[in-house]
């Protein structure tokens, strides 16, 4: 069976974005046409379906590296912030975009929070989480997409047929 580990991201992510858009698992918010995706960007994305592509990339990262949190995802999707005459520093992606996408993926039943421990807060006990991991339904979707693009991947990368 082909899994997410067998398919490169440049083939897998567009196919997963198309599957998620068809599946109605994710929907683009109204404000998504006006926001930048990171602090190092100057303008909003030019693609009309960028929300689905970002959600697919987030789901792929969770499937490969889960449990994973919002901060780690923001660092992974960030770039280099231009500081003028000063050296460039790492720029993080928008955490609001990542959180909203994760909330939509949770409502669709594709990812879930991983509880770690309960600590005592000012208002009583507070549940802490280690991040999010993929659910069985999410794994089924990801593996189904990976299996559907296997032939295209083998034609583009002939060495992958060994795996």
Stretches with model-predicted labels:
Residues 122-163:
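Short, amphipathic alpha-helical interaction segments positioned at domain boundaries
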Residues 1-56, 60:
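Long, low-complexity, charged/polar intrinsically disordered regions in eukaryotic proteins
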Residues 78, 103, 143, 147:
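Residue-level detection of the helix-turn-helix DNA-binding "recognition helix"
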Residues 106-123:
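A short, conserved structural fragment
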Residues 73, 98-108:
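Basic amphipathic alpha-helical segments that dock to polyanions
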Residues 57-65, 76, 101:
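Short amphipathic alpha-helical elements of helix-turn-helix/winged-helix folds
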Residues 67-89:
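Short acidic, hydrophobic short linear motifs in intrinsically disordered regions
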